Each structure stands twice: as C-alpha cells, then as structure tokens.
C-alpha cells in the first residue's frame, strides 16, 4: 500500500508534508510525490524533488508502494487525488462506467470526477472553468461519495482536492488508516506519528463510518455518516446452504486478493491462517506465482506452540514454511522498533505486534511485498473465550467488527508497512462480513465450540480434524513473546510489563475520561486502563434522579466527588431526570464537556455484560469522535470479584435486591468469604456473582489508585422487604492510608 498526507491553510505546509512523508518512509519506496495548487512533482526520494513556484498553504503528499502498474501520485486531472488503496473490482467498475484507467487509484479519481460532472449537469451550472467546484452543496458531494464508495470492493484511504474543497474517506471497516487534525487549518496522514512532529495537538483517527469534507475558504468541516452492516435479517436457510454460501464467499475473498507476484502468509498453524493457506494452495494461482508461510517465535529449548504446530501443519499440507526464531536480546531490539510503531504500551497489543513484526522481517528478507493475514475471523465468527459467555453472540460480533479499526487494523497496518509489506485480510472482505454477521449464533458457537462454521468448512475442505478442533491461543502466547517480555521486565527490575515497555514509548497511550458510577466496575476498569499506561484526565458522573435507571448507578452517587478527591482526578457531574429519551443526551453533554475541557480521546466504561449500556455509550461516543474502552467486557464474574479484593479494592454493597441477599449484606466491607457465598448462591439459584442482574450495587472506599481512603462515619440502612435493602451514607470523610 502507500502513505498519504496533506496540509491545508497552514503557512509551512510544504515543509510539514515533507516531514510527514519522511516519517512514513517505509510505506512506499517506489516513488514520492507532492503537489500544491498549481504544481506537481514526482521523484524517487525527497532529495530529488524539484519544487516549482506555488502556494505552500495547501499541499498533498504521497509515498507509493506500487502493486498494479506504476502510476505516480498525486494524480492530477480536474482535481487531485492521493490514495492508499487496493480496489479489487476496479476493472469491473471501468467496464460499467466506460472508464479506461491504468490502475485502481486512477479509476478512483476518474470515477469521482465522472460523478461530480453528473452533479453539475443536474444543477446545470454552465461554468467553463473545470478547476472549481461550482458551488455544489456539500451534502450532495458527500452523498455522491458515499454512493460511489458503496460500489467499491476493497480497502482504501484517500483524499480528493478540487478548488476550495478537500474530502477524505477510508474503507468502511477501517482496514486502511487515516488520521487528521483541525487545529489551525487541516492536516491528515496515514499514520498518527506523521502528524505528531508537526506540532498538531488534536490528532484524531477518522471514523470509517464518516466521510469528511473541509472547506478551505471558510475553514469549516462537514461530515457525512455512512451506513454500516447489520445483523438483521438473520439467515433462515438450512445450515448446509449457509455453509455452502460461507465457503463460496470465503473462497472469493481469498482469490480476488491474489497478487501478480510471489506473496506470503502470516501462519500460526491455527485454524484461521491454515484455512487461508490451504485455499491459496487449492484455488488455482496464476502461473509462476507462489507463496511462502511465515511464523515467528521465541528461541528457547522447547519450541513455542505456534512454531511447533505451524511446522506440523505445513508438513502435512505440503506448504512452504519459514520460521523466524529470535532470542531474548533480539526481542528487546525488536521492541525498540515495534512499540513506537504501534504508539502503544498495551502488553497484549505489543505482543501480537512483535509476533507479526518478526514474521514480516523474515518475509521482507525474501523480497515479499504482499502478505495474507487471518485477522478478523475471531471477531466475525465468535472466536474469543468471552463469546462463550455471551447471551447475544451476534450483537457482540457486530460490536467487535464495528470497533476492529480501533483495536487491530492500525496495529497490523503499521507493522507490515514498516517492512514495506502490504497486508491483505480475506476474512474482512466486505461481502463476507455482511453475510457472516447474519449467520445464526448457533452456527458460530455450538456447545463449547467457537467458530463452528469455520471449523466445519475446514473439515469439508479435507483439513485434518486435529486442526479443526484446535483451541485458539493468542499470538503473543503461542509465540512465547509475552513470556519474553515478562523475562525482560523482570531483568530490568520493572514492576510490570507495561512499566518495562514505557521506556520505548514515553507518552501515555491516550487521554481518557471515565464514566464513573462510584461502584466497583468503573473503578476497576479505570485502574486497568491506568496500568496499561492510559492517562485518566477526568471522571464523568451522571446523577440520575430516577432510582430505577437502566443506564446509571444511583446509590450514594453524590459521594463520587469524594472519591475523585481521594484520587486527585477532576470530576464532571451532570444531573439527569433519568428519562429514557433524555438521559443519553445528558450523558452526551457531560462527555462533550470532558472532551472540550480535558481533551479526552476516549471513554472508559465498567460494562461487563449489559449490551443495553454499552451500545448506547458507543453510539454517543461515535457521534463525538471518541473511542470506547470496556476492559471488563465478559470477564468471568467470580474472577472479577476475587481480583478486586486481591489487588486492594475495599468496597461495600450499597444496595441489594435479590433472593438470597438481605440487609446484612449492605454497608459492610466485602471479603473473600462473601464471594464464596455469592458463588454458592450462583450455583443454587443462578445469582450473578458480580451483580450483573441488578442483584446489588456497590460503593468503593479505597483502591490502588486512591491517595486517601474513605471512612464512613454515619449511614442509614433501609430495609424495603426481606430481600431488598439499601444504605444511605450520611457522613464520610477522607483519611490518610495506613
């Protein structure tokens, strides 16, 4: 793929664009291009560029990783385009619209300009100057782009500039990255790190479900919301028909991604990557085009599980496999590259990135420029352990796909592109995703078997039953790189793996606000994010006047300010009547205040199992351009309760409302023996151990991030009936910790 950037209404745009292109050097080594309003230059490197006179307020830049023909960018016709794209149906689009194009990017700009002319003819502008936009309403242009992109099959991130307008968009799943800033003009780039050195402070990731328009003359922004996939209507055909359709779509997703040159496959020997490799072997490659599988792991006496299994599968299926094994010292050197690349010290994220990076290094040494990945199968087909605890599997799959751009695709893109390798992800094919989200949950999770339909497909293909039944192991564990990070952290005297990784990336991952209820879940979720090097800028508390609110915790919520003081974190409070129609708007106002006052980039929630809460929070945050983190999502409830106690949280039950509980539970500290009792009640009557069914609410008195603890000096216990009681804390103060 490629790297794109642009700077508009900024005095030193040319200098900033060149700096951004240099930061993204490995995204494209075939050509570099840059243009302004009246000039365009291409060269093999920045030193060879020769600039003509022209305005430097507005500049587009591009780094080319050429895969289909050799078309330099920016491309200039009536307007100008920079694109990081791989469009698999560009030839079909050319036939449909009668357009001759040299490659997919060339097709994209020609198609945009064809559609633009249609808008002009509909308005009969009659202007002879083709270089201006003729005052077509912004909403019409954005809608046209949305309709055009709906016809495109593939992945992309692009910018189109015509006259006083520029538009940016990315594929609907966010496989190709795009970041932007609107502080003092407008800037964008394929990677966040390309904008950081330019002094931008409000860098945001473009939501793939938005098309973004910028008016140069008025310095204004317009966005257009794109429709996403749906889990309805669910497929009702017999299961054998669904299996046939699924296999056909998967085979097509693989075959359309075949490049015209030798390629690689990220291979763990697990279900997802082995199915991809087997299909690549059997679908009929082009003459002379072959592939190699690559896997990586820690070099130690015992083979890492993924390396051992990859070797067995490769031998059994006749696959060409190369293994990259690295020792502890080399792991540390790789971490110096990987952690700044992914711009994160999140331990699982770094572990996965390290595994991929090592495999990509081996592929790069072989001259590989395209690799296939099995990414997306777990999100699409319920492949994680947490899916086994889900009551609404397809809604969870939908949420995973909706947010996959925040969690996985940017990491994978920057790691592969740093090795000058384009990553292709068949499981995230648009048609396949649309189909799979509507597959009945029972065909994804059957008994205790996840990804059931993919396992069935593997057996239908003739793959070994052993493979089809193999349980998933995350890449960082299967490669043993997580173990290596642990050893390095211990050797360095770091308290945690995150502390050790901070030396490679000294910034906080993101600035976050916490939807703070005063209870155990929001407190624990915040602690987890702090431990992962996220900066907690503020707490956000919604004080509901409705005691029966499904959205917001109400017991003793007025004491959230005391908890905030104990932690030394600012608190934003918003009162709501708790009416279903208005409480989300009140929450949105509070989060918007946090964004404006503290510059937060995301929200932390303590959601465990409530889709009702999580989906509404995600909808609000989507509208505000914020990411959502729910680190407790689908955690085992007994595990959560025991972890809270083991790491030093001190909390009481502030209310109870369930058979098996009574007033003796409220107002006193919860201990291990109480968790034992809750577990027995769960076994006997199905009571939720962590109170997820509304059995109880909690109030935190102390925790690892509290500088002082809360001492309750007076409280009132109110018994409503035999199984329902609550406590009102009437006097509480902060005291020094022992």
What are these language model-derived features?
Residues 8, 165-167, 175-177, 233-461, ...:
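ATP-dependent adenylate-handling active sites, centered on carboxylate activation for C-N bond formation
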Residues 414, 421-426, 430-437, 441, ...:
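ATP/NTP-dependent adenylation/nucleotidyl-transfer catalytic domains that generate, transfer
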